Swiss-Prot record:
GO terms for cellular component: nucleolus; small-subunit processome. Residues 278-287 have a biased composition (Acidic residues). Keywords: Nucleus, rRNA processing. This is Probable U3 small nucleolar RNA-associated protein 11. Its main location: nucleus. InterPro entries: SSU_processome_Utp11. It comes from Leishmania major. GO terms for biological process: rRNA processing. Component of the ribosomal small subunit (SSU) processome. Residues 1-52, 200-235, 262-295, 311-361 are annotated as: Disordered. It is found in: Nucleus, Nucleolus.
Length: 361
């Protein structure tokens, strides 16, 4: 019979299934909870062992210092360097083993690859932005200049050459012919195009018939006769230019500047209604004032356009220069990675060369 323990000597195999009292470790009292958790026995044992190791190590160091031979020599003393700041000997850099050195080289190559990709991306972005700015400036300069009249049209006979009409061939008006081909369009396209309300109200950009043009010419002649100007070609050209500027003024009546000009002109006209003999002079003075304001506004627009162009030119130069710098930096980093790869390849090949020097063991 198997001997057991306790009150049931024959049931020793069932002792582990008996219910026993659970012994709990004491917790930290509430008055000392601000100090943290209470140290348990296993924590105390671990701390005591560490303290004994430190005490033993300090005792060994003190004993070695007390028994040190002043004439003792060690080969490491020839390479030891003392740090003047703290009076301690500087630690020599630990030489890496071959596996660690290879891993560091591979890490450097991976970092260089990412840096090269980022630098090339930024350089390409700057180059594309500079190209876009140059294309915008070129397109604006192309469409704002007058045509060079280099369009050559070939005909089949002498009769077609004599009766050739460029307005009918290109389907444009004389005013459209003076514009650049990229922006002038065609009459049949403009007839089907819905213009914005402000352009329709201003009276500009509309195709006029021959009767309307004759009426305009008669109005110009009547105004010249009332103003008493000489009927010379130069005087007529200057007068027509002022009238055109006055008509163009109507296209910008939605701006504050020209609204002010309009109010001033209306005030001047209402104050001078009692002098019917001076209508021509007053109208001419008002037109001259409006033309002057319009020319000043045009000069201001040209100045703003010149400032924007200069800003674009400066930005293009800066972006091109930065793109070159980033490309040069990426090239140098790529060259460094190639050198590291070449060095790793040489190390790999030198292991199998019969005449290669080997490090003494």
């Amino acid at each position: 019979m198997t001997k057991g323990k306790g009150r049931n000597p024959g049931a020793s195999g069932l002792d582990k299934h008996l219910k026993r009292k659970t012994h709990l470790e004491r917790s930290q009292p509430k008055s000392r909870q601000h100090l943290g958790q209470l140290e348990k026995h296993k924590d105390h044992v671990l701390r005591a062992k560490k303290r004994k190791v430190k005490v033993r190590r300090l005792q060994e160091i003190k004993r070695a210092a007390a028994q040190r031979n002043p004439d003792e020599f060690n080969i490491g003393m020839t390479k030891a360097v003392m740090d003047v700041a703290n009076g301690r000997m500087r630690q020599r850099r630990v030489r890496l083993v071959e596996s660690d050195r290879k891993k560091d080289m591979q890490t450097t190559i991976e970092h260089n690859r990412r840096n090269v990709q980022y630098l090339e991306f930024k350089a390409q972005a700057d180059q594309q932005r500079a190209t876009e700015l140059l294309n915008e400036e070129a397109a604006a300069a192309l469409t704002s200049t007058a045509p060079q009249n280099k369009h050559i049209v070939f005909v089949n006979s002498e009769e077609e050459f004599r009766s050739f009409n460029p307005l009918k061939h290109f389907d444009v008006t004389p005013e459209m012919m003076r514009q650049h081909p990229a922006v002038r369009g065609r009459i049949r396209v403009l007839e089907k195009t819905v213009m914005p309300e402000e352009i329709l109200m201003s009276g500009g950009h509309q195709i006029k018939s021959a009767a309307q043009k004759r009426k305009e010419r008669r109005e110009v002649q009547e105004k010249m006769r009332r103003s008493g100007a000489d009927a010379t070609p130069e005087t007529r050209a200057a007068f027509v230019e002022r009238l055109r500027a006055k008509k163009e003024l109507k296209q910008y009546q939605f701006t504050d500047l020209l609204e002010e000009v309009k109010r001033e002109s209306e005030a001047t006209a209402s104050s001078s209604k009692g002098a019917p003999g001076d209508d021509g002079e007053q109208e001419e003075a008002a037109a001259q004032d409006e033309v002057t304001r319009l020319l000043e506004w045009r000069r201001e627009q040209e100045r703003q356009a010149a400032i924007a162009t200069a800003r674009h030119v400066r930005e293009v130069g800066q972006r091109i220069q930065r793109s070159k710098s980033l490309s040069a930096l990426a090239k140098s980093i790529r060259k460094q990675s190639q050198g590291i790869k070449r060095q790793m390849e040489q190390r790999r090949e030198s292991r199998f060369k019969p005449g290669a020097t080997r490090r003494a063991r």
